[in-house]
Amino acid sequence: MASAELDYTIEIPDQPCWSQKNSPSPGGKEAETRQPVVILLGWGGCKDKNLAKYSAIYHKRGCIVIRYTAPWHMVFFSESLGIPSLRVLAQKLLELLFDYEIEKEPLLFHVFSNGGVMLYRYVLELLQTRRFCRLRVVGTIFDSAPGDSNLVGALRALAAILERRAAMLRLLLLVAFALVVVLFHVLLAPITALFHTHFYDRLQDAGSRWPELYLYSRADEVVLARDIERMVEARLARRVLARSVDFVSSAHVSHLRDYPTYYTSLCVDFMRNCVRC
């Protein structure tokens, strides 16, 4: 079972979200109950207690919620080196749906920052395989993502994760990360592209057609607003129902903290509209 090998949290409510229809089906039987599954993919260095605040948005409304954050060293170093180790984690995450026998329920992803997006890109690839192609994804919410090759922003994010580490170790890791990015994604970019596609490019060209909601802020210093706006334009060009909301003043992954009521209403309305469709 994937559950034995993955550090995740799942919350299953006592009552489902709602029924497929408010009235009996034409055959006279009660309509089948829908219980949406929401998978939260945390940002690099995110703690479960941080994701729990977002989890409550959906759990209080009767949704099954799975929370997971990929290890920060995989997010910052494995992906930068072109090592697809996150693909294994993405597969285990999707296997959880079968372990809990919820693979037939409508599925929504809520993805945070580039750390969540790096994992999500492999989810998209796995959804094209025989094992997972029947999963019913109804929508994706992106919070403060995706960003495209912002080294300064990535260094800020990594520095925040390493804040409590020894000063010398923190400096060494930051320098090592910067060197890896410059070497593999600038100097050797043509060679790297032969065996590894950047997650931003992968998302731009993704064949998924379910609705997407992008929540971002022009005040974000980690993921630039222009990167998200460019992604929205690319998805719209591929005829995906993509919508974006600019919170203007909130910092990176801080939109819920600064605008709790508005943020919650956006997520709940999007989830409900996606499930009903």
Swiss-Prot record:
Family matches, as SUPFAM superfamilies: alpha/beta-Hydrolases (SSF53474)
Biological processes, Gene Ontology terms: negative regulation of BMP signaling pathway; negative regulation of ossification; negative regulation of osteoblast differentiation; regulation of nucleocytoplasmic transport
Transmembrane segments: 171-191
Pfam family, one: DUF829
Main subcellular location of this protein, as a coarse class: nucleus
Gene3D superfamilies: alpha/beta hydrolase (3.40.50.1820)
Membrane topology: Single-pass membrane protein
UniProt keyword list: Developmental protein, Dwarfism, Membrane, Nucleus, Transmembrane, Transmembrane helix
Location(s) in or outside the cell: Nucleus outer membrane
The keyword Methyltransferase is assigned to this record: no
Top-level lineage group: Eukaryota
Disease with which this protein is associated in UniProt: Craniotubular dysplasia, Ikegawa type: An autosomal recessive, sclerosing bone disorder characterized by proportional or short-limbed short stature in association with macrocephaly, dolichocephaly, or prominent forehead. Radiography shows hyperostosis of the calvaria and skull base, with metadiaphyseal undermodeling of the long tubular bones and mild shortening and diaphyseal broadening of the short tubular bones. Affected individuals experience progressive vision loss in the first decade of life due to optic nerve compression, and deafness may develop in the second decade of life.
Family assignment from sequence similarity: Belongs to the TMEM53 family.
Annotated function: Ensures normal bone formation, through the negative regulation of bone morphogenetic protein (BMP) signaling in osteoblast lineage cells by blocking cytoplasm-nucleus translocation of phosphorylated SMAD1/5/9 proteins.
Protein name: Transmembrane protein 53
Gene responsible for this protein: TMEM53
